[in-house]
A protein has these predicted regions:
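N-terminal helix-cap/turn-to-beta initiation motif at the start of protein domains
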Residues: 10-25
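Buried hydrophobic residues that stabilize the cores of well-folded domains
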Residues: 27-31, 39-42, 121, 134-141
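Bacterial Sec-dependent N-terminal signal peptides
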Residues: 1-11
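A short hydrophobic beta-strand element
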Residues: 24-26, 100-104, 132-136
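Central antiparallel beta-sheet cores of small beta-barrel/beta-sandwich binding domains
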Residues: 12, 29-117
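Beta-rich strand-turn-strand
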Residues: 128-130
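Edge beta-strand at a domain terminus
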Residues: 94-97, 133-158
């Protein structure tokens, strides 16, 4: 018999292993919920730190950013070094059928949501039977309370 903690830790490890299937270079067209002009999004995933971290290097319309995914204290987290000049730390809040949703810990990230825009959530949607495509979405919270959603279907380059 396994304890609930061990079962949860195992599920988190499974989700981290699923993320490792993204290793490689990806490209897609980022659409905006505002109707703004779409732009190219390039992602490059690599495993780092003796297998304990996944590095996502992104280039969105010429703006480079980094996100590091790792398991800490039995939680899958991401730390995003953003072009908006802040550092949202997010935690996996759900994982169902390959769709992993992360939500930013606003207070823990030191973000003042009344003064700055920041990424409030990410969704990485693995597609069953498709190793060369996945859905990518993130939402930006603005100081006025509006949320802008950006989505792309990512296709493997290498």
């Amino acid at each position: 018999m396994t304890s609930g903690v061990n079962s949860y830790a195992s599920a988190v490890d499974d989700d981290f292993a699923k993320m490792k299937t993204l290793i490689g270079k990806w490209t897609g067209t980022l659409e905006w919920s505002t109707g703004d002009k779409p732009e190219t999004l390039n992602l490059d995933y690599s495993v780092r730190s003796n297998g304990s971290a996944i590095l996502e290097e992104s280039n969105q319309g010429g703006v480079e950013m980094l996100t590091i995914f790792n398991v800490q204290n039995d939680k899958l987290q991401s730390t995003h070094y953003c072009g908006l000049k802040n550092k949202p730390v997010s935690y996996l809040i759900s994982s169902t059928n390959g769709v992993m949703k992360f939500k930013t810990d606003i207070e823990g990230s030191g973000i003042d949501k009344s003064k700055e825009s920041f990424v409030i959530s990410w969704t990485i949607g693995l597609i069953e039977g498709e190793k060369d495509k996945f859905n990518y979405e993130y939402k930006v919270h603005n100081p006025d309370g509006t949320i802008v959603t950006r989505t792309a279907v990512m296709k493997r380059m290498i």
